[in-house]
Amino acid sequence: MNAIGKSSAIFVTLSGLFWGGWIVGSQTPEGQEAIARAYAAYEEQQSAASANLFDSTALRAVVCGDPASTEQKPCLAVVAAGRMFIVDAGSGAASSLTRRNIPMERLAAVLLTDADLPQVADLSAVYGASTHGRADALLPVYGPAETQRLVDGLNQAGGFDGASRGLQAWGPSPEPGRSVIVFEADGLVVSAFTTQEDAFEGRVGYRFDYRGRSIVVGGDGRVATASAARDADIVLQGAETQRVAQVTGAFSAAEAAANAQALNTGMMMLTGADNQIAAQTQVAEARAAGFDEVAAARVGMLVELPLANSEINVRPL
């Protein structure tokens, strides 16, 4: 069992020791010592799992955010080449990553799919967690044209100038059908792209290519229709059930699945469902459209694309 898998097993053991020790003898020195050892083992395994996230053997992504929030909480942490990128800093982004001992100082940039409040709800907290209060720290924020306005407001509220401290906005401004590289180093290429529909709505998608493996992230955009999603190992796409899509005009899970299949996508992960029933319905409708490799994203889920083979591994972190 690898370090990531071991952390779940140790957490179960820790829970059993905690409750068992509390009931039958946590007030004794022996009980307290057992609980302390369990906590130490859990922390050690969590640290090892976090370290493994940043090795060079795979392209990885962690679904982050606040699972208890009733509001939209878009957040995905993509890890490759020893760096981390957060796509959409939704509610609970910083705390969900720090709880899992993921080192926020590895954060290279935040990428916004939409310049709206749900995408930046936790951006200030992400900045604070990633800079550890350094006086001269800057955090690049990429996104649509309106990103500059949002970043300026957050910098003003935090007392930052945006030049030597705070958030620094960058607008890649891709044209429909043409990608723009926003980061390239050590075998990792991060590209921004948009579609005709998403350009009208002010939305941007991102593709991460790392030594033959690829992840495409689009928030609520229609990235599954974009040429940039062709042959991607996995596409993370916001969608709605057929019933909701008919009323709102949103992208349905069935539409997303049909497009993913046409573009030879390896797997599609649906994001943004408000509840478990909606998530299950979306997956069922997507599979009914003829594309079986579909899953619903959940906070704490790890996606791992090993460089040594073509596997797509999905499991809890």
What annotation goes with each model-predicted range?
Residues 2-27, 221-304:
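Cap/insert and terminal regions of metallo-dependent hydrolase folds
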Residues 31-38, 137-175:
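Acidic/polar short surface loop at catalytic or gating sites that assists cofactor/ion binding
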Residues 91-93, 115-118, 147-148, 197, ...:
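Solvent-exposed loop/turn segments at secondary-structure junctions
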Residues 75, 94, 104, 123, ...:
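Extracytoplasmic/secreted envelope proteins and their assembly/folding machinery
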Residues 84, 91-142, 169, 231-236:
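Active-site metal-binding motif and surrounding structural segment of the metallo-beta-lactamase
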Residues 86-90, 107-119, 142-144, 216-220, ...:
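Active-site neighborhood of phospho(di)ester-bond hydrolases with catalytic His/Asp-centered motifs
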Residues 5-7, 19-102, 171-227, 299-317:
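Core dinuclear metal-dependent hydrolase active-site scaffold
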Residues 106-107, 133-137, 213, 262-269:
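Short, surface-exposed connector motifs at secondary-structure boundaries
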